[in-house]
From Swiss-Prot:
Protein known as: Putative monoglyceride lipase
Keyword Membrane set for record: yes
PANTHER family reported in the protein's UniProt record: PHOSPHOLIPASE-RELATED
EC number of the protein: 3.1.1.23
Catalytic activity reported: Hydrolyzes glycerol monoesters of long-chain fatty acids
Keyword Hydrolase belongs to the record: yes
Active site (record annotation): S99 (nucleophile), D219 (charge relay system), H249 (charge relay system)
Functional description taken from the UniProt entry: Converts monoacylglycerides (MAG) to free fatty acids and glycerol. Has a strong preference for monounsaturated monoglycerides. Required for efficient degradation of MAG, short-lived intermediates of glycerolipid metabolism which may also function as lipid signaling molecules. Controls inactivation of the signaling lipid N-palmitoylethanolamine (PEA). Involved in fatty acid ethyl ester (FAEE) catabolism. FAEEs are non-oxidative metabolites of ethanol that are transiently incorporated into lipid droplets (LDs).
Pathway per the UniProt entry: Glycerolipid metabolism; triacylglycerol degradation
Length: 378
């Protein structure tokens, strides 16, 4: 396994409720949005992060090696290691992926070696297909696949513009100025990403973990219809799809105060799936246990912060390992003294840690008239 840069955000305000392994998107790195991880810490959620091979501080060889991953076969072993690294706790463990990372999270929930260790999967604007305006046709995809086998590390610019990432102009400018954020990647990573997404949709009936998918309606990078398709076909009976009107691609770094509403909604889902429960064996996947079936239904409702919410979820059976003894804490309103954040470049045998302190805005409770369309089918 290649050396991978890792950074763990464990400075929670009070008692930790859950732990998340976060997978960043294409062309990004985990230090690109520290305020997001700090906001999760404010909600008593620990976060373990890493720069994927070929990106950020895990990139080897400078800009000429941007997005050179070595191939799809190496990605899951990297993720196996990150999940094992984060499993040294009684806290329930969740896998949260954004964009390219969201597609990886869904695929790992289907066939990942350690998926039984997960209490649930959160796929944010997952890369299953490109937005219809940019989705390559069949012939172009076929050509890309063939050429990538001959010249896997040939660099290609996806031409994703920073202004399409979030409505927060200050964040867009910061991403544009960040030398480690780039729209360039290897032909191999593009080919793998597109082909993996198509196959993941086909395999949706084999997904049996608790599932939350979130997508912005104004995302013009990835296809929200594909997210909905995966949700509808997923084998799990514990699944929720949330659609946020007006949100761009990166929901976790959207403009304030709407981003706080978003994080509150996702945190509430994590809290709900962090409660201890009875278990029975799943017929579909005997290696995974799930809580005793329950059935509830709900109509579109308003969120606690007053933002109209349309949410669709279906929750009759949760097919994940029951979470450990962890009780949800209320969403804190302000920051407090915290444990140090650990940052390292890792190999499987060693984790080198140094203390860092991340400064970001606390996540206040929000009262706003903006809409957040979320669909709940229980």
């Amino acid at each position: 396994m290649a050396d991978l840069y890792t950074k763990d955000w464990t400075d929670v305000k009070d008692k930790p409720v859950a732990r998340v392994v976060f997978i960043h998107g294409f062309g990004e790195h985990v230090n690109a949005y520290p305020e997001f991880f700090e906001a999760l810490n404010e909600r008593n959620i620990e976060v373990y992060t890493f720069d994927q091979r070929g990106f950020g501080h895990s990139r080897k060889g400078g800009p000429k090696k941007q997005g050179c991953t070595g191939g799809w076969s190496l990605v899951f072993p990297d993720l196996d290691y990150q999940i094992l690294r984060a499993s040294d706790t009684e806290l329930p463990l969740f896998l949260w992926g954004h964009s390219m990372g969201g597609g990886l999270a869904l695929r790992y929930g289907i066939s990942g070696t350690h998926r039984h260790k997960l209490a649930g999967v959160i796929a944010q604007a997952p890369m299953l297909r490109c937005h219809p305006d940019t989705e390559p046709n069949f012939l172009l995809r076929k050509a890309l696949t063939l050429v990538s086998k001959v010249h896997p590390n040939f660099l290609f610019d996806s031409d994703v513009q920073s202004q399409h990432i979030t409505r927060d102009e200050a964040v867009n400018q910061r991403l544009q100025d960040d030398p480690l954020v780039s729209s360039v990647g290897s032909l191999q990573v593009f080919s793998d990403m597109l082909n993996r997404g198509t196959k993941t949709i086909e395999l949706a009936p084999q997904f049996f973990l608790p599932l939350l998918i979130t997508h912005g309606t104004d995302d013009n990078v990835t296809c929200s219809d594909s997210s909905k398709e995966f949700y509808e076909n997923a084998g799990t009976k514990d699944k929720t799809y949330q659609s946020y009107p007006g949100f761009y691609h990166s929901l976790h770094i959207e403009k304030k105060p709407e981003v706080y509403e978003y994080l509150d909604k996702v945190a509430a889902w994590i809290y709900e799936h962090s409660k201890p429960s009875e278990t029975v064996k799943s017929e579909q996947e005997t290696a995974v246990e799930h809580p005793k079936p329950t059935a509830t239904t709900s109509a579109p409702s308003a969120s606690p912060t007053g933002v109209p919410v349309e949410e669709e979820s279906h929750k009759a059976t949760s097919d994940a390992v029951p979470p450990a003894e962890a009780k949800p804490e209320p969403v804190p309103a302000s920051a407090a003294e915290r444990a140090p954040t650990s940052e390292s470049t890792t190999v499987p045998e060693t984790i080198v840690a140094s203390t860092t302190k991340v400064i970001s805005e606390p996540a206040p409770r929000v009262t706003t008239a903006a809409t957040a369309d979320i669909v709940t089918n229980k």
